[in-house]
């Protein structure tokens, strides 16, 4: 999916900066990798990633696809052959690490961009229901038996609180 490719670009950009910091690649190599990764993050070159997320092993195919695309486009950007898919773009990395890391980045982004806003909407809807049902008394239940009466709005506030504090 597009979001996985985006996450791989974020990861490869971060790795390039770390590899520059530790003198594993040159500044010119880092600049070329970062430029291509930022373009991929902006949605460019997605047609260069034909693989499906379902694949054998540890995601080696997607990792190598990313390395090769970044290397090819980075060399075009630098106007010279300074990047190699394994030796520079994939420096200090392993498919066993990059694929799970990219998945974690993708999931974290999806949680922040999609799940949390939906939970905020749910919380607001429950607050409205609490206000609309204020004063309505219902029988509490515990151990499949009747318990102390409570306001329906209190029960709703318990559900809301669980969502807010989870």
Question: What is the role of each PLM region?
Answer:
Residues 1-166:
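Conserved, well-structured ligand/cofactor-binding cores
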């Amino acid at each position: 999916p597009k979001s996985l490719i985006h996450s791989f670009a974020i990861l490869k950009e971060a790795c390039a900066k770390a590899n520059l910091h530790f003198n594993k690649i040159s500044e010119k190599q880092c600049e070329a990798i970062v430029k291509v990764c930022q373009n991929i993050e902006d949605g460019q070159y997605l047609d260069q990633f034909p693989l499906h997320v379902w694949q054998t092993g540890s995601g080696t195919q997607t990792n190598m696809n990313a390395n090769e695309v970044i290397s090819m486009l980075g060399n075009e950007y630098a106007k010279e052959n300074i990047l190699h898919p394994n030796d520079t773009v994939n420096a200090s990395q392993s498919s066993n690490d990059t694929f799970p890391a990219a998945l974690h980045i993708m999931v974290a982004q999806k949680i922040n961009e999609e799940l949390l806003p939906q939970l905020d909407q749910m919380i607001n809807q429950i607050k409205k229901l609490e206000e609309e049902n204020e004063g309505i008394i219902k029988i509490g239940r515990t151990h499949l038996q009747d318990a102390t009466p409570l306001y329906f709005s209190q029960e709703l506030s318990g559900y809301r609180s669980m969502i807010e504090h989870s």
